[in-house]
Regions:
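Residue-level signature of catalytic and energy-coupling elements of molecular machines
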Residues: 3, 38, 71, 153, ...
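A conserved active-site cap/scaffold subdomain adjacent to cofactor or substrate pockets
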Residues: 61-85
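Gly/Thr-rich phosphate-binding beta-strand-loop-beta motif of the actin/hexokinase/Hsp70
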Residues: 25-56, 71
Length: 176
């Protein structure tokens, strides 16, 4: 309806993961086989390309906003600040930053290993209270949700008997 109101016509509609695959993968990657994972705020989609063609597409209703709310809840910080933390300081691979292997959340808190990040916390409307956390703590909050999303996608591919179709080339994209 919005298209018609603006005097626009469509030739066809494309799944967002398919469009991401066309934009992000080279022709060779699409030919050899690749899985594109397109993580948005509310959904995460996958598209599998093989021999230059789209062979599978799926979407789950979990996206980057869940990661943001996890950060906000654990750190008692406003959603906007949690989003900034995720985008600027977030990582699922703390070893890449610190040279230390990833630890579960409880181990990060107990051991206190990595560099620090200062974040605002929820307080009264008239004052901003800040706290300092370790970068590995942020990673330990983010990593389980990303693992959950990837495991759900892997389960969907397995259910559709597509888990081995594209080999081991995965490309992550999206705005989340």
């Amino acid at each position: 309806e919005a298209l018609a109101l603006n005097h626009l016509e469509t030739d066809r509609f494309l799944h967002s993961a398919y469009a991401s695959g066309l934009a992000c993968l080279t022709a060779e990657e699409r030919d050899l086989g690749s899985v594109i994972v397109d993580m948005g705020g509310g959904t995460t989609s996958i598209a599998i390309f093989m021999e230059g063609k789209l062979v599978y597409v799926d979407t789950i209703k979990i996206g980057g906003h869940r990661v943001t709310t996890d950060i906000a809840r654990v750190l008692s910080t406003p959603i906007a600040d949690a989003e900034r933390l995720k985008a600027i300081d977030g990582s699922v691979m703390p070893a890449e930053i610190t040279g230390i292997a990833p630890d579960p959340l409880r181990e990060v808190v107990r051991l206190g290993r990595s560099d620090n990040i200062t974040i605002p916390t929820l307080g009264s409307a008239t004052e901003v209270i800040g706290q300092t956390i370790e970068r590995n703590l942020l990673s330990a909050i983010i990593r389980p949700r990303i693992e959950e999303i990837l495991e759900l996608l892997q389960g969907r591919m397995k259910q559709a008997q597509m888990e081995h179709t594209a080999g081991s080339r995965y490309v992550l994209t999206g705005g989340a």
